[in-house]
Amino acid sequence: MTAKFTDYIVKDIGLAEFGRKEISLAETEMPGLMATREEYGPKQPLKGAKIAGSLHMTIQTAVLIETLVALGAEVRWVSCNIYSTQDHAAAAIAAAGIPVFAVKGETLKDYWDYTAKLFDWSDGGTPNMILDDGGDATMFVHQGLRAENGDTMFLDQHNSEEEEIFFALIKRILKEKPKGYFATLAKNIKGVSEETTTGVHRLYDMEKAGKLLFPAINVNDSVTKSKFDNLYGCRESLVDGIRRGTDVMLSGKVAMVAGFGDVGKGSAASLRQAGCRVMVSEVDPICALQAAMEGYQVVTMEDAAPIADIFVTATGNKDIITIEHMRAMKDRAIVCNIGHFDNEIQVATLKNMKWDNIKPQVDEITFPDGKRMILLSEGRLVNLGNAMGHPSFVMSASFTNQTLAQIELFQNQGKYEKKVYVLPKSLDEKVARLHLAKIGVKLTELRKDQADYIGVKVEGPFKADHYRY
């Protein structure tokens, strides 16, 4: 008799059937991943790969996980945000016998305890690959090894509640695990593929400092990720989160978007299409000019604070909305964030004020003068905390890139140095091509003489690496 599978932590395993039905629906909308299974499945290019995955545990991610497994990988998974898990998706993955540790609304302590579980495999071994979103799994290994090698002063110098919890975890592991635990992890991991802008910044910082422990592929800067997921995904999912959280009429409202990168562009478009009058703030003169040329009013947060009804941060930076800004806002202004981390809004400065939880991930905060503010997802990702994240189709492009990156790193161990790389343009174009038929797109084909005239191959790539799209 086979032992019952218990290597998981989910909210309710009884949600597995519901999750499986939604996974089936999502597969229809994820042609890139399904084509990848068909093309690579017989070759089993990930056989022997043991992937530690830290990425929002959604229905779409379930399709990614099962694609990796179909290509031969063993997988352990956690969510990279305490509010982004879809519990029925996690249940379906657990019911399929895949270790997953993710609960929507988990505590920060649980979050980091679950992250530690990524690296403790049931056979006593370790992962040899990381698939990351935001860089927390990668940071776990790097900071753990730093402390293991004797540099422990930083463990007592936390700047946030989350850092305090994370550093306490490292201290505990150093006491409980055999000496050399983190060194073994670092040695065994052959590479990481990173999903998002914030995590990529961390990787480049470590590379620049000469501290990157293994090769990395920057999936975020694949064109078929950043110009689609970040832009068109946010265009659909931002207003979904605000509406589900507040039921507010968006048409006619004044909305303020901080940041006009790809996520900010998608967010501003989302609000404009909902009928909002949209303002934008920027530090980059190029992005500011882009926003102005798109017809947005470009102002500072100080200008917008007393005027706007809705505030969205999308910068990847810290302290974008300060306590002073919040004090200047209208009564019951709606404040949310769509950047990866929760420090864009100074939520910590609000802890001593009166909090009234209206429903999950929706809080009304009352200031001493009686003014109230609606905060969504405690300043964490609003589209995943208050809604279901990006639609399946756009995530198919991102996750096809992730799958190809995992194959590239695992199949070519020793080829890459401890640096950050991007996937070649030929693969970027391949990912796009896999998604065309689903939406009825018919490509024009170059004749040989036309291709020769512009100096490309008939089958592509069609653009130089420096082309910006």
Curated annotation (Swiss-Prot):
The keyword Hydrolase applies. Keywords: Cytoplasm, Hydrolase, NAD, One-carbon metabolism. Binds 1 NAD(+) per subunit. One of its GO terms (cellular component) is cytosol. It catalyses: S-adenosyl-L-homocysteine + H2O = L-homocysteine + adenosine. It comes from the Bacteria. Belongs to the adenosylhomocysteinase family. This is Adenosylhomocysteinase. The lineage of its organism: Bacteria, Pseudomonadati, Pseudomonadota, Alphaproteobacteria, Hyphomicrobiales. The gene is ahcY.
